[in-house]
Amino acid sequence: MDKQQLASTVNKVLDEMRQRPIPIGISSRHIHLAAADYARLFPAQPIQPKKALLQPGQYAAEQTVTLVGPKGRLNNVRLLGPLRQTSQVEISRTDARILGIAAPLRMSGNLQGTPGIRLISPFAELELSGGTIVAQRHIHMSPLDALILRVSHGDSVAVAIEGSDRRLIFDNVAVRVAPDMRLEMHIDTDEANAAGADAAQAWATLVTKP
């Protein structure tokens, strides 16, 4: 096989890899807590992992809280671990309407100017001064995944949701690259419902490049 044939074969394999299915994680409403806020809501209670998530070291905990807004409340909202530097509440647009909170669309961690919310646990209540967002849809990936897919951290791409009877293309999907990340697209329950997506059966494919 000469160099031209080898290059052609490599490019063909890479093109096939770029079309491989991307797993979908459907994010229900959940919270992340800073250590001090966790200690106040769950005094002397160690975090109890309930289910491991696809991203390494991350998990859904046994602990839940109630979210309370000006217009309503949402019960049994799951805590995700491990603990973070800053508390954050992630909800859908539908949840925001129920609560009566004008939660902005943000990437995780971009919390400046976000509204607060009241959290109630079985042990205590806590009023957060900010940190409530609707999470922007995004894809986690490793540097190798990014190299294969020809994207970079911070890029915005379009992604097709496949495997349902309501195939949908989402624009403005943020790319998040880190060495410890596994390939996975995250959408919220509103977005999953719009696409008729079930995490066990649906998948995503990259359809445009930045």
Curated annotation (Swiss-Prot):
GO terms for biological process: propanediol catabolic process. It is an enzyme of class 2 (transferase). Phosphate binds at residue 84. Involved in 1,2-propanediol (1,2-PD) utilization within the bacterial microcompartment (BMC) dedicated to 1,2-PD degradation by catalyzing the conversion of propanoyl-CoA to propanoyl-phosphate. The gene is pduL. Zn(2+) 1 binds at residues 30, 32, 90. There are 2 Zn(2+) ions per monomer; Zn(2+) and CoA bind inbetween the 2 domains in each monomer. GO terms for cellular component: bacterial microcompartment. It catalyses: propanoyl-CoA + phosphate = propanoyl phosphate + CoA. Its EC number is 2.3.1.222. Formed by 2 beta-barrels, each is capped on both ends by short alpha-helices. CoA binds at residues 26-28, 71, 78, 193. InterPro entries: PTAC. Zn(2+) 2 binds at residues 138, 140, 186. Its main location: other. This is Phosphate propanoyltransferase. It is found in: Bacterial microcompartment. Its cofactor is Zn(2+). Pfam families: PTAC (PF06130). GO terms for molecular function: acyltransferase activity, transferring groups other than amino-acyl groups; metal ion binding.
